[in-house]
Amino acid sequence: MRFIVTGNKRAADWGAVYIVKKIKEFNPSPEKKFVLGLPTGSTPLQMYKRLIQFNKEGIISFKNVITFNMDEYVGLPKTHPQSYHYYMYNNFFNHIDIDKENVNILNGMAKNYKEECRKYEEKILEVGGIDLFLGGVGVDGHIAFNEPGSSFKSRTREKQLTEDTIIVNSRFFNNDITKVPQSALTVGVSTIMDAKEVLIMVEGNNKARALHMGIEEGINHMWTISALQLHEKAIIVADEDACAELKVATYKYYKDIEKKNYNIDKLIENLYKK
């Protein structure tokens, strides 16, 4: 597992640069599309802003990219301002050159949630699997809506949300926890781990314990982030604030071996060089 330390609030920028790098290396075509797994939430917003910039400036195209989002609230229509459909189109898809037929998001209003989840997994297999899955992490270490205690063998399914997650997410619902959906459709831990690469972005002091548990402690189903230790090509990129609970030796070790990769401004500059 790789671990990259960036400046504060720059993990999302690093993620954007890495997406561009991987798509360019893949060199997608209409016959061979790049498959990207995408998150929602606060941390990825800057990543999407940066990717929109790169797209408008001709640095990258999404015409031959297929996307699968991680999750969606149960019971929210696509037009609801807090649905992840609304989030993705408003903050990303409406501003880039992606073919909307290549966008895949779970339907929180489906008549049969089990069937919706089964078809989602089936479609991922049909396109050859996910090449790169992006994600954030919750304060309790959850990825997507794989809350503490989620099976590492889990697949896309409906998942009940913990009280902590509902309270945290209430900030998007006028701080009214009664308006927050009680469950969501989410890709499973195995769905994420099956991706060829996984990149998790961690920003802020409130994520410091989750980062510590994911990197320095053993694999534990109560900390979903720790499953990444089992992935052959997992990357965690975190800002300085998120490193607050790491051992000094761990911090210094990764800063040293990844010293060529944490100067985000230099990495962005390199994208503009032909």
From Swiss-Prot:
Keywords: Carbohydrate metabolism, Hydrolase. It catalyses: alpha-D-glucosamine 6-phosphate + H2O = beta-D-fructose 6-phosphate + NH4(+). Its EC number is 3.5.99.6. Pathway: Amino-sugar metabolism; N-acetylneuraminate degradation; D-fructose 6-phosphate from N-acetylneuraminate: step 5/5. One of its GO terms (cellular component) is cytoplasm. It is an enzyme of class 3 (hydrolase). GO terms for biological process: carbohydrate metabolic process; glucosamine catabolic process; N-acetylglucosamine catabolic process; N-acetylneuraminate catabolic process. It comes from the Bacteria. The active site is at D71, D140, H142, E147. The keyword Iron does not apply. It holds the Pfam family Glucosamine_iso. One of its GO terms (molecular function) is glucosamine-6-phosphate deaminase activity. InterPro entries: Glc/Gal-6P_isomerase, Glucosamine6P_isomerase, Glucosamine6P_isomerase_CS, NagB/RpiA_transferase-like. Catalyzes the reversible isomerization-deamination of glucosamine 6-phosphate (GlcN6P) to form fructose 6-phosphate (Fru6P) and ammonium ion. Belongs to the glucosamine/galactosamine-6-phosphate isomerase family. NagB subfamily. NCBIfam families: nagB. This is Glucosamine-6-phosphate deaminase. It comes from Fusobacterium nucleatum subsp. nucleatum (strain ATCC 25586 / DSM 15643 / BCRC 10681 / CIP 101130 / JCM 8532 / KCTC 2640 / LMG 13131 / VPI 4355). The lineage of its organism: Bacteria, Fusobacteriati, Fusobacteriota, Fusobacteriia, Fusobacteriales.
